[in-house]
């Protein structure tokens, strides 16, 4: 019997809700499982990969444009022939190989430049949701940078309509609930902060799915305190604060995000491990870190996976969530990030289920929604272990 989940890279079949495959179906040939060869970590048992593939999940740190699959990127590049982005999906593998964080930003912005019409926005958003659903993502807070689109001439109202139309279609067709985080592209300065805050707080424009306000882009030379007035406005309008911090800079940046931007979660927070007082603060206040292991290696924020500080975070009692950041660009997906976490933390099925529930608990979903997904995780895990 074939598992009720499919590899988003190899099929366009309808998406169905996952259930644990029977024991006989586990360990079957590669190609019949949800992960492709290059994503199957040989240090993680095949049974555990199969468990992860069907595990209901929430994802809290994943970027809109950065989640565009090679197929969608190549389609958009073909639409806009003046772009330097390759139209061949195979060539994108080399194009998405980064020398450092600055190079990643350059490549990322070249893909951003492909999103030029409301139709591009809707296509991207809908297809990102489709890929999430195939990984059993029940709920996701997708980071969107509206400034990058409106400055390229997309009407702001049409932009909001496009993401909302895709959100509603995705929930109706795939069962995946999307919510938005509007983030400031830090490299674009205070002009982008003003524009993003306006779009996030203007009741005539603010989309129904918006729940949080963030800050992304390079950290070096982009001080967090300068964005305080814009976060204050967003928080006053009822949005949650979720800035990136401590990805490529030291723990002081995380402190600034906590103190000046009133962060409720920290994007990455990788350097927090360098400051015991900061770890204790995060643990005591139950402030989650949105950890993205493969991303940190791809951008050279961390040298190797074995050196990733996720183990220090867990030992210190800091709430940890697992995320994919910009998955196709980093040659990963959320299932693979769970497999990486399983290896680094020595997790079995119950440990992975607890990790998935961390993501649900740290989300901005309402209490009934959290309880529903947590119950689904428990039911799935119990059925798997009993089979």
UniProtKB/Swiss-Prot annotation:
Cofactors named for this entry: Zn(2+)
Q: Which Gene Ontology BP annotations are present?
A: menaquinone biosynthetic process
Give residues annotated as binding substrate. 116, 183, 217
Tell me the active site.
Answer: 247
Instruction: Give residues annotated as binding Zn(2+).
Output: 61, 63, 244, 325
Quote the biased-composition stretches of kind Basic and acidic residues, using this chain's numbering: 1-10
Q: Which Pfam families match?
A: A_deaminase
Span list, region Disordered: 1-37
Sorted keywords for this record are: Hydrolase, Menaquinone biosynthesis, Metal-binding, Zinc
Q: Which InterPro entries match?
A: A_deaminase_dom (IPR001365), Ado/ade_deaminase (IPR006330), Metal_Hydrolase (IPR032466)
MF GO annotations: deaminase activity; hydrolase activity, acting on carbon-nitrogen (but not peptide) bonds, in cyclic amidines; metal ion binding
Q: In which pathway does it act?
A: Quinol/quinone metabolism; menaquinone biosynthesis
Paste the cofactor note.
Answer: Binds 1 zinc ion per subunit.
Swiss-Prot/TrEMBL catalytic activity = 6-amino-6-deoxyfutalosine + H2O + H(+) = futalosine + NH4(+)
Q: Please name the top-level EC class of this enzyme.
A: hydrolase
PANTHER family reported in the protein's UniProt record = ADENINE DEAMINASE
What is known about what this protein does?
Answer: Catalyzes the deamination of aminodeoxyfutalosine (AFL) into futalosine (FL), a step in the biosynthesis of menaquinone (MK, vitamin K2).
As for family, the record states: Belongs to the metallo-dependent hydrolases superfamily. Adenosine and AMP deaminases family.
**Name of the protein this chain belongs to:** Aminodeoxyfutalosine deaminase
Taxonomy-wise, where does this protein's organism fall, top ranks first?
Answer: Bacteria, Bacillati, Actinomycetota, Actinomycetes, Kitasatosporales
